Curated annotation (Swiss-Prot):
It catalyses: di-trans,octa-cis-undecaprenyl diphosphate + H2O = di-trans,octa-cis-undecaprenyl phosphate + phosphate + H(+). This is Undecaprenyl-diphosphatase. Its EC number is 3.6.1.27. It comes from the Bacteria. The keyword Hydrolase applies. One of its GO terms (molecular function) is undecaprenyl-diphosphatase activity. It is found in: Cell inner membrane. The lineage of its organism: Bacteria, Pseudomonadati, Pseudomonadota, Gammaproteobacteria, Lysobacterales. Catalyzes the dephosphorylation of undecaprenyl diphosphate (UPP). Confers resistance to bacitracin. Its main location: membrane. The chain crosses the membrane at residues 38-58, 75-95, 106-126, 136-156, 181-201, 217-237, 241-261.
Amino acid sequence: MFELFTALMLGILEGITEFLPVSSTGHLLIAEHWLGSRSDFFNIVIQAGAILAITFVFRKKVWSLATGLDKYSNRDYVMKLATAFLITAVVGLAVRKANWQLPETIQPIAWALIIGGIWILIAESVAKHLPERENVTWSVAIAVGLAQVVAGVFPGTSRSASTIFLAMLLGLSKRSAAAEFSFLVGIPTMFSASSYACFELFKRGELLHENWLEVSVAFVAAMLTGFAVVKWLLGYIKNHSFAPFAYYRIALGLVLLTWLT
């Protein structure tokens, strides 16, 4: 029963943190430090729940883009989404083949949380002096693609934080537009990464000993929580900055570093 409870908690944690700029990977690793580690497949499945949540939130936007390619604005937006995704896929695969990734331990995660918090504050400070723009440029698309790779290499960075705030610094100063582009790019990116990782686990026969009840509970928890959090966040950022998330990251990072000493 305790294992089922921890699976539920980890699913909820994934749903809360996946699309907030606080690093879901970092929070899951911290939680697993006390609750016990889970299999790679478990972590893939709960991320899949979050992917379904964000897909459902943006279902109308996705459908509009898919059925409206006769419009230049839609074609341009889709091409930029595709560019960001392909950059992430190509560079990310090269990084994966090179086994280039920091160890998933508490100390580097703590530093990534702190640095990411400072990064958010800088981006907010710069963006508020820029005219409000919601047009995605090619430089933003390319930078977002590379930022996703950086987030994958450095646990604790946060895919949302690295992509949203780099986009804001490069001129996509309207928070909702930056967040929307980040989330839409995240759908194919996370789906592809999860599918690839799951296929690798399947080939190695590592799916035979999973507790499917725990996996299912965590999946549903991540999906429902992720949906609620994204809906809330999209409303919140219309009239608020991301600064509270920055302060939270910095505080959590400092607490973790203090705990390690």
